Amino acid sequence: MDMNEIKEIFFQECEEQLAELESGLLKLNDGDRDPETVNAVFRAVHSIKGGAGAFGLDDLVSFAHVFETTLDCVRSNRLEPNQDVLKVMLRSADVLADLTNAARDGGGVDEARSRQLIKELEALANGELPQAAAESAPKTTPAGVAPAAPVVNEEGFQPVAFSFDDFETGDEPTIEPSTYEIVFKPKSDLYSKGNDATLLLRDLSRLGEMSIHCNMDTLPPLDRMNPEEAYFSWKISLKTDKGEEAIRSVFEFAEWDCELDVALAGGTVGMDEDLPMQPVPFDLSILEDEAQAPAGEEDRAAASEGDSRNAAVAAAQTASNVLQMAQSTARVSPENARNSQSASAAQAAAQQAASAATPTIRVDLDRVDRLINLVGELVINQAMLSQSVIENDTNGTSSINMGLEELQQLTREIQDSVMAIRAQPVKPVFQRMSRIVREIADMTGKSVRLITEGENTEVDKTVIDKLAEPLTHMIRNAVDHGLETPEKRVAAGKNPEGTVRLTAKHRSGRIVIELADDGAGINREKVRQKAIDNDLIAADANLSDEEVDNLIFHAGFSTADKISDISGRGVGMDVVKRSIQALGGRINISSKPGQGSIFTMSLPLTLAVLDGMVVTVANQTLVVPLTAIVETLQPEASAIHSFGSSQRLISIRDSFCPLVDVGRILNFRGAQANPVEGVALLVESEGGGQRALMVDAIQGQRQVVIKSLEANYTHVPGIAAATILGDGRVALILDVDAIVAASRGQSLKPEMSLAAAG
């Protein structure tokens, strides 16, 4: 594994830490004052800072350090996390995410914004904002006030009140440097755990003046040396004014992989004084060199020509660089204790918790995708085998059939297990929307509150990855277009703070995501006039409210009076609709003037496999998702009733349900089929309505592999995807909700119907 791969793992861990940071800050913003929430937020920033320091990402380290210092003030109860404080911290979390992305992608950041937030964070750490409401408090650090040092909250000590005026004289108190004796003994597997002694010593040298003695007593002969193991240990003398906590924080990510003793000069340290020590000149320029690959055969041959001790020094340099070829693993370390006794207790407790935790492993998504594809092929081959057994009319009691049934069960279990690997909660996407709301609210001068529900609803990772873009467009529209300004809301008798509600839930085997706002609703007159001006509809067109609302999905359509950085170019909602359709989903709008709008997106839980009922319609084989079917029944002539010229109803247990001829909806036939000669599938749409879909016959139930029709052909209304049956035939999977919508009068266009697909 090279350095780029290790960095990528670090950035993946940063994404997790940023999500934890965002979640914790939002909890605090909602009034949560659980100390563990504060600790989780602090650990997230501290972990990012520690990893960034190992890779020399100085900008990220500097900002995270100031952020961490301010959070430590909250941890030690020296700073009250009121709304003003949390606003600064939420914006700081956004900047921390920007710096992380810039370090990952090589892009730029808003340096002016970063500097401003550093000033605000330093001001908070210095106590310049009161703990109560502080609307009039300054947002920048006054001249003459130095940034706060990390707060030390040792047990048995109480915070002491003081005045910042004491620092205005220029005679700032200084802390006398102390000399610490440090013994650092890495365990043999230090490098394989993602740590490097040279990086740790480099970070330690930044704390003050340092001299080092290296113990090479455990160094084996060259022929038995493993360059991936650690053999050296160090005794370090450090003169610093930072204190013991700062020293221990350098080794925080290696504390489980080494023995570390820190004591003031003159105290007792853990290394045997009789052990042979060899002074090592400490040249930081050596540590700054880029790590190279392990020595080749020529290097090892050259090393073997000299004394084994001299060769060992070269081998040790190679060993220190091997980390950059080793896999780095995520670590959630316990908080550093404030003294040596609490440090030992915290470490023991953390190790016990870690041993009890559920083990996890990080796997490349490409490997998971390949596994899912193989499972899909396994499902197809299992179906083909079942078809062959049926065609050969094998005795149902034979060992072949028994083995086939076991194979079907195992295939189902494998498929369920694999799909569970890819299933992830929508929480990361929802948390990302919080930042969008904050940014748009600041740009528009609106007061907006985002409420999220169903964050733990799970869906396939492919769906989650492609969900962020359409949700971003919808959130921007909801805040910019949907919500009124505080003045207009007050005039309308509303709360000046607007509300955007984002919810996720499972329904009918799909995931349904709703985005609702309590704004003014869609101005249908304005939408209609804009559509007429753009020649989208005729001036005398008679459109329902639903049809008018759906006009906003046309490409280039916008009701904005002027173009801004947020909206007005008409490239938003059409992108949303295309993105949702590409995932096999749908989007609907419900709006009430003066009350707001609701956008409902319906998406499949997975894009890989589904359980379906194979049916025949006009000599064509189709698949209906089982999750949408309530029951099947054979219609009787007495249960069929005509309504109007073309509508038919079927009586089911003293209630009437519209009867939909699937073949006619899909333009497979012109005249309606005789319902008595077919089978009715009672289906339920996501909106809760029921329809009886009329098909010619039922072939059976199958687990089928979903193949994208849009990727290979185009989007076909009424069709969700395609699949390959056991006999090799291609069958199309019905989009039940689209069929139900078409039965309400929104007929499918002939040129885009199933017949057009060939």
Curated annotation (Swiss-Prot):
Molecular function via GO: ATP binding; phosphorelay sensor kinase activity
Keyword Transmembrane helix: no
Keyword presence, Cytoplasm: yes
Record's keyword terms, sorted: ATP-binding, Chemotaxis, Cytoplasm, Kinase, Nucleotide-binding, Phosphoprotein, Transferase, Two-component regulatory system
Organism: Rhizobium meliloti (strain 1021)
Gene: cheA
Function: Involved in the transmission of sensory signals from the chemoreceptors to the flagellar motors. CheA is autophosphorylated; it can transfer its phosphate group to either CheB or CheY.
Major location (coarse): cytoplasm
Name listed for the protein in its UniProt record: Chemotaxis protein CheA
